[in-house]
Every structure is written in structure tokens, then in C-alpha cells.
Regions:
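The canonical Cys-X-X-Cys-His
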Residues: 74-78, 128
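Short active-site neighborhood of thiol/selenol oxidoreductases, capturing the structured segment around
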Residues: 61-74
Length: 168
């Protein structure tokens, strides 16, 4: 009996230990994209100084800065933004990040700001840049990943933010 108990405790401990502590928070059936989708882009042309101040201020507040280049005419931008507004995702983002939406209109404004971060020009939005505390772009190799947000699940978008947080 004692050996069975020890074996059971050992297996239980092993199972609990093998769980990923940083496993993703899962969405449930209540976490749905709401209509109408948001229009987060405001038509403002930003300077490099304004962008740099946003990044620096966010880092000083112990959060990770996110720049999202996009436009209100783009369905992928609106779906991505709408997904970020799902309450569970929004709460997570507010705890870990500070987000700045950068309007590009029809690729007419703010596009030169991408050069500041060595991001090559290419069409397709949203372009999402997530920075760490040293101003490094964490997703430098895949800033174009969300150009197909309409084909992705809300959970995939949430997993992206979870993987970019300082928790991981």
C-alpha cells in the first residue's frame, strides 16, 4: 500500500512538474469578436521624436511598446484591433504593453517611420512591432505576420501577445 502511494505521489509530482508554467491563457466561448469593428487609426502624421518618446515612456513604465502600422480601410487591421479589444485579451495587453496605432492611410503617411527601425517597405498591413526594454524589436523577422489577421483565430492573436510579453 505504501509503495503504491509513493508511486502515485511520484507520478502526480512528475505530471505537475512537467506542466508548462507559462502555458497560454485560453479564450472561451464568451471571448468573441464584437461588431462593429473598431476604427483605431486617427490620420495623424507622427515624427520620429514622437515615436521614440512613446517607446521610451512605455519602457519607463515597465511595459513593452507596440507600434501597429495600419489603416481603417484595411479589414485585417480592424479585425486585429477588434481582437485586441476582447476583454480577456485587452486586460492582458493593458497589463503588459502600451499600444500606439500609426495610420499609414493608403501608404501615404508614416511609412518612413518603418525605416527608422530597419523595416523594409512592403505593402500589406497591419505591421506590428513589439519592443523589449532595450528597444530591440522582438518580432523583427515577422512584422508582416498579421497581414492575414482575418484568416487567424482570436486565440492565435492572443497567443502572439502572450509570447511577446515579459512573462515569457
Amino acid at each position: 500500500m505504501y509503495k503504491k502511494l509513493i508511486k502515485y505521489l511520484y507520478l502526480s509530482y512528475f505530471f505537475l512538474f512537467s506542466l508548462n508554467i507559462y502555458s497560454n491563457i485560453l479564450l472561451d466561448e464568451n471571448d468573441k469578436l464584437q461588431s462593429p469593428l473598431p476604427l483605431p487609426y486617427n490620420g495623424i502624421t507622427y515624427t520620429e521624436d514622437e515615436i521614440n518618446n512613446f517607446i521610451d515612456d512605455t519602457i519607463k513604465n515597465n511595459k513593452r511598446p507596440i507600434l501597429i502600422f495600419g489603416a481603417n480601410w484595411c479589414p485585417d487591421c480592424r479585425i486585429f484591433s477588434g481582437t485586441m479589444n476582447i476583454p480577456k485579451i485587452k486586460s492582458f495587453i493593458n497589463e503588459n504593453f502600451n499600444v500606439m496605432y500609426v495610420d499609414v492611410k493608403r501608404y501615404e503617411i508614416n511609412m518612413t517611420l518603418l525605416k527608422e527601425f530597419d523595416i523594409p517597405y512592403s505593402e500589406g498591413i497591419p505591421r506590428v512591432l513589439v519592443f523589449d526594454e532595450k528597444r530591440n524589436i522582438l518580432n523583427n523577422s515577422n512584422t508582416t505576420e498579421w497581414r492575414t489577421a482575418r484568416d487567424r483565430s482570436s486565440q492565435e492573436i492572443f497567443n502572439f501577445f502572450q509570447s511577446m510579453s515579459s512573462i515569457n
